[in-house]
Amino acid sequence: MAALAPVGSPASRGPRLAAGLRLLPMLGLLQLLAEPGLGRVHHLALKDDVRHKVHLNTFGFFKDGYMVVNVSSLSLNEPEDKDVTIGFSLDRTKNDGFSSYLDEDVNYCILKKQSVSVTLLILDISRSEVRVKSPPEAGTQLPKIIFSRDEKVLGQSQEPNVNPASAGNQTQKTQDGGKSKRSTVDSKAMGEKSFSVHNNGGAVSFQFFFNISTDDQEGLYSLYFHKCLGKELPSDKFTFSLDIEITEKNPDSYLSAGEIPLPKLYISMAFFFFLSGTIWIHILRKRRNDVFKIHWLMAALPFTKSLSLVFHAIDYHYISSQGFPIEGWAVVYYITHLLKGALLFITIALIGTGWAFIKHILSDKDKKIFMIVIPLQVLANVAYIIIESTEEGTTEYGLWKDSLFLVDLLCCGAILFPVVWSIRHLQEASATDGKGDSMGPLQQRANLRAGSRIESHHFAQADLELLASSCPPASVSQRAGITAAINLAKLKLFRHYYVLIVCYIYFTRIIAFLLKLAVPFQWKWLYQLLDETATLVFFVLTGYKFRPASDNPYLQLSQEEEDLEMESVVTTSGVMESMKKVKKVTNGSVEPQGEWEGAV
């Protein structure tokens, strides 16, 4: 490749090169976003995998929903010991809780168990066959597994690649025409059946299908691949390669049963966030004199959240209609989601530190928090994007999922530190009754602003010393008491904000997750409803607590503190401006007391 000719001077190329290097991480992220997952039409390719169990997918089915599984290639790198068993399992549950048989020891092999409540597909590559073992309740509670060579319900039974739509339509016709045949399946057929598979040089390929024909068969179905070793063989010496395609569909949507309402839910919540942002902008324009920089940052948050929800709804709409997202909409959603997450945690941390409310410069300790929170939040959002765009059965999926949980937990803990530090400063200021030697950042800011006003009135330093010396002791103690009361009131407000953040974290991270595990499969969308509702309530309450209005307890207390300083200075100095101190002389003696006399 020919070298590019240099353009411009070396001095001009330096900044351009540095700017280009700074853009490399963003370009890498965009390249990742440009390859989203295939939605509910899944394709997974594993090469030399050593895992004992691979979770291929989980999907909630309504009546007349179906799944088509096409194993294009499955090959083994067999060790010397042939005592190995591989196959698939199909589990059905009513919610997203953990299946009991999957929580066993790592050496536990479900394929070798005699009595199980799941459907098993056990492969025998040497004999080029697969055995289907169904539990006793398979006739009514579980659907029948159909192979393309068993019953010609998939249209072209001898071809491995089948159109999922035509397969579903043809199968539905077969079920309608042969309903009596399905209902009279003998016990032997429901117990165990064997089917031949295509073997091409040790790589087998086959296709199976099932249809949800009754209401009792509705549920959350999970498909797993298992590798069972004998005589405690090392797992790394026994690898497998798998190329599989899975198509899942409900009657009117490619979305899982619990995800079908999500597009409408996201659009509705986007409207409420947009409405709250509009109201907030109206408040800022109405109270311009009380607005700080942080208020405008808070205004950007609901609009960014609303845009993210709109693009998320569009993304789910295309997945629902065609089984995979449109890349452009997916990329836009991921970008807005990344911005929303970073902006949310930055805003929470800035409010906790009191930036713009009580101080305009962040301390070194505050800056360290932002140096931790911002990269962690970006990493958490990148992990979320990778999870959304990666198939569930890949090796990196579990790693990124665990990383997302850990990083998000660290972010939630880190944003609490600025609030705790502000509370500690206020406690120290309140404990000293407002004495100047231990004033917290709130009192310091009020005094600085009062001092700037004093300078604007052209008071000399000598006048300030005179005012301080002439201030009665009772006035000083009164001011100290008022300052302590102000600090206590601000301390109460920051404690409320701390509780508000903790409740937000609990509702969106813990309670919502427990709800997701507990509710039936068709109500899984309640998890997203609770998460979005809790976020909206958190936005509204935070805006109410720190609203730019004269009746805001936080801002009102700061204003009262400043007014107290100005009233003490301006009123006293205005009276004393034309006064002078004199001593009364009576019969040559000087009286100790003094009084004020007006200067003529």
Swiss-Prot record:
Disulphide bonds in the chain: 109-228
Signal peptide: 1-39
Single GO biological process annotation from the record: clathrin-dependent endocytosis
Name of the encoding gene: GPR107
Segments on the Cytoplasmic side according to the record's topology features: 285-293, 359-368, 424-498, 545-600
PTM: Cleaved by FURIN to yield two fragments of 17 and 35 kDa that remain associated via a disulfide bond.
GO CC, any one term: plasma membrane
Record-annotated membrane-spanning stretches: 264-284, 294-314, 338-358, 369-389, 403-423, 499-519, 525-544
Protein family: Belongs to the LU7TM family.
Entries under InterPro entries matching the protein: GOST_TM, GPR107/GPR108-like
Protein name (database record): Protein GPR107
Subcellular location: Cell membrane; Golgi apparatus, trans-Golgi network membrane
Membrane topology: Multi-pass membrane protein
Molecular functions per Gene Ontology: clathrin heavy chain binding
Glycosylation sites: 70, 169, 211
Compositional bias (Polar residues): 157-175
Role description: Has been proposed to act as a receptor for neuronostatin, a peptide derived from the somatostatin/SST precursor. Involved in blood sugar regulation through the induction of glucagon in response to low glucose. (Microbial infection) Required for intoxication by Pseudomonas aeruginosa exotoxin A and Campylobacter jejuni CDT. May contribute to the retrograde transport of bacterial toxins, including cholera toxin, from the trans-Golgi network to the endoplasmic reticulum.
Main location (coarse class): membrane
Organism from which the protein derives: Homo sapiens (Human)
Region Disordered, annotated ranges: 157-185
Keywords, comma-separated and alphabetical: Cell membrane, Disulfide bond, Glycoprotein, Golgi apparatus, Membrane, Signal, Transmembrane, Transmembrane helix
Ranges of Basic and acidic residues composition bias in the record: 176-185
